[in-house]
Each structure stands twice: as structure tokens, then as C-alpha cells.
Amino acid sequence: MQDTTLHIRHLGQQDYESVWHAMQHYTDTRNSDSPDELWIVEHPPVFTQGQAGKSEHILNPGDIPVIQVDRGGQVTYHGPGQLVVYPLLDIKRSKIGVRQLVTHIEQSIIDMLAKYDINAYAKADAPGVYVDERKVASLGLRIRKGCSFHGLALNVDMDLAPFRRINPCGYAGLEMVQCKELGGPQTVIEAGDQLIITLSQLLGYQQLVHHQGLAAS
């Protein structure tokens, strides 16, 4: 039976690797009674290379670090002004399939942007969310022990130039776009507050409990 309470952890700006390892630790040590959590964070500039990633898609990283990680998908960029959301959910307990989870995440972004009269959409063959063939949100998950970690990255108000140093998600010439220039949410906080609402509703959570920072381990 699904626990209808979702714990939201607001992490501020944090180093990618420390949050990644904390996600792994939470997933590896959780049990059937552990609460589902949503981590809201921004990262300093970093390229992350997923398990399907190919080195030739990293064109010119320059001084931005490249980290090989254990999520699905290929290379992407994280940086200040981008909303990153990590759903740490027991999908086995809630009986949500992986494809259904991906669809819910994409739809939550589409629904949130629709509040700003932005016509966004998903693509069956290329996970993420798009507006006029430009990508506004990237998606990469990992499922371990029936539980999800990693998640989504929504471009809000950031420097998009580093995306030109890679083939985003393995697609050469893929153009990125962000909420601010589309007339969407203007800050990461605003985007996060709105996305929490749409995502929790789609996933069936009825009570949200907010926390600042990670739980003491």
C-alpha cells in the first residue's frame, strides 16, 4: 500500500557528488517502511555522463568537471539557475512502473508550464520535455531494489552556454531553452514550488512535509 505522505527536502545549492552519494546511501539503506522523498537542489557547474553515455558526446568540457554516474541516459549539464529534482520513491510499494514514473515526471513539468501558457510536450523516443523542438528539461533515472533515484533537471534562469560543449543527451546540435525566456517561472524557487505541486498530485501523494537539508545519517 502506498504511503500518501511525501517528504520534500530543500537542499539549496550543493556539490553534485555529495548529493549523488547521499541518494545512493538513502536508497541502499531504506526498507519497506522508509518514507518517499523529493530532493530539491541546484548544483555548481558539472557535466554528468550517464550509463549510456559516449565520450565523443563530450566535445569541450574545459574547466567544468565531468562525472561518470549510475543513472540512465547520456551526458547532460547542471549549473546554477537550474532546478534539479530527485524523486527517491519506493515504486515497488506504490506499484508504479518505471515507464509510468517517467511519464508522470514529464507530465508534471508539462502541467506546470501550462500554468504559464507554455505549450510543452514529451517525445516517445527522447526522454525529457520540449518547447518548439528545444529542450527545457532533461530526465535520467536509476531503479535499485524497486526504488528510484536521480531524476529531472529543469532549465529556469541559467547560463545555457555550457550545453554547447556537449551533445546534450547524445543529440548533436540539440538546442536548449529555459523557463525565463519562455515566460515561465523566473526563479528556481518558484519553479520548484510549482513542480512539487504538479508532481505530487500525479504520483498520488496527499500530504507534503517540508524539510531544510538532508536528514542526519
UniProtKB/Swiss-Prot annotation:
Belongs to the LipB family. PANTHER family: LIPOYLTRANSFERASE 2, MITOCHONDRIAL-RELATED, OCTANOYLTRANSFERASE. Its main location: cytoplasm. Pathway: Protein modification; protein lipoylation via endogenous pathway; protein N(6)-(lipoyl)lysine from octanoyl-[acyl-carrier-protein]: step 1/2. Gene3D superfamilies: Bira Bifunctional Protein, Domain 2. The active site is at C169 (acyl-thioester intermediate). One of its GO terms (molecular function) is lipoyl(octanoyl) transferase activity. The keyword Cytoplasm applies. The gene is lipB. GO terms for biological process: protein modification process. Its EC number is 2.3.1.181. GO terms for cellular component: cytoplasm. It is found in: Cytoplasm. It holds the Pfam family LplA-B_cat. HAMAP family: LipB. The record marks K135 as: Lowers pKa of active site Cys. Residues 32-207 form the BPL/LPL catalytic domain. Catalyzes the transfer of endogenously produced octanoic acid from octanoyl-acyl-carrier-protein onto the lipoyl domains of lipoate-dependent enzymes. Lipoyl-ACP can also act as a substrate although octanoyl-ACP is likely to be the physiological substrate. It catalyses: octanoyl-[ACP] + L-lysyl-[protein] = N(6)-octanoyl-L-lysyl-[protein] + holo-[ACP] + H(+). In the reaction, the free carboxyl group of octanoic acid is attached via an amide linkage to the epsilon-amino group of a specific lysine residue of lipoyl domains of lipoate-dependent enzymes. The keyword Transferase applies. This is Octanoyltransferase. Keywords: Acyltransferase, Cytoplasm, Transferase. Substrate binds at R71, G72, G73, Q74, V75, T76, Y77, H78, S138, L139, G140, G151, L152, A153.
